[in-house]
Amino acid sequence: MLSGSPFSLVNEMLEAPGVLRRFDSNAVAGWTKTIAAKGRLMITGEGSSRIFPAKNAIDLAMRSGSALHICTEGARQAAEYDLSKYVVVAASNSGRTRELIGLFEKLAAAKIPRFGITATAGSRLTELVDECRVLSCGVERAVASSKTVLEQALFCQSLLGGDEWKNQSRAAGYCEEVLGITVAPEITGFIQSAPLVYFSGRNNGVAEELTLKANEIARKKSAYLEGTYALHGIEEVMRKGEALVLIEPFREEVEKYKAILKEGVGLNVVAIASFDTPFPTIKIPALDGFNGYLQLMAGWNVLVAAGIAAGVNLDKPERARKVGNAV
């Protein structure tokens, strides 16, 4: 991915490592006291503002053995639950996402502790929360969210109080390296020519977020295959020429992916991984606490390369909107 691109999306992606480098991991220290007292946290939002930020935080909490109970749902589903024993944190770039505002009006009436993260100062969300943080990265011009997703994820991660922040600068450097990787024409061709692109990975928000980004950036139909879902029956309807992107695949199952999906179905399989695989692979560094960001940015790189090769306007999809469902 090259700097000086005519596309805002590319330039905003390239700003992301700097956002990580400058992020203040103590910015929401006051929130953590309220969360610790409750012991339960619901992270909500819609689309890219929730998928990676919330699920990355949950993944890191589980890996660290945190006693904090964290869950995530979209705002409409969260509104159906009893959240009286929770602290609720929401992210919305616009601060006026319809589903989210409806939930937070309900939470405000019930006086349930609630905090917000937004790119838009003075938005409706800021009026409904106990406290709000405005993203330092600024508002994006491209429809597809990138640097805001990263900063929202950093805020959610900082609620966990982990010790990985000592590697923050190193992580930012690795992110720059990943965004600077030249994507092999073979990989770009597989994505560009595929009628459908599958993304397979852990339930940590990376593969799921890239599934959405494939629609917005590369204009590709896509499907998210959680965990090892790809090995449990979907091969029946997969077709030769479709593409599968494996995100840091489970080492124990790599040969199964090869035998069943590449050789059996005829899928064009590629990987984003910190180790060598039998497939065309974008090899990336590994760093505890920041692996999700590195994997996500490698995926951005692949999708941008495919989109540019296809000649699409990366900044402006024909139908997708920056604010999907606004008040």
Predicted features by range, described:
Residues 1, 5-15, 48-49, 53, ...:
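Catalytic cores of large soluble enzymes that bind and process phosphate-bearing ligands
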Residues 4-9, 129, 266-327:
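Phosphate-moiety recognition in structured ligand-binding domains
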Residues 5, 9-40, 131-243, 310-327:
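Active-site phosphate/pyrophosphate-binding segments
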Residues 36-182, 235, 242-282:
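Glycine-rich phosphate-binding loops that contact phosphosugars or nucleotide phosphates
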Residues 55, 153, 208, 296-300:
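Short, well-ordered alpha-helical segments
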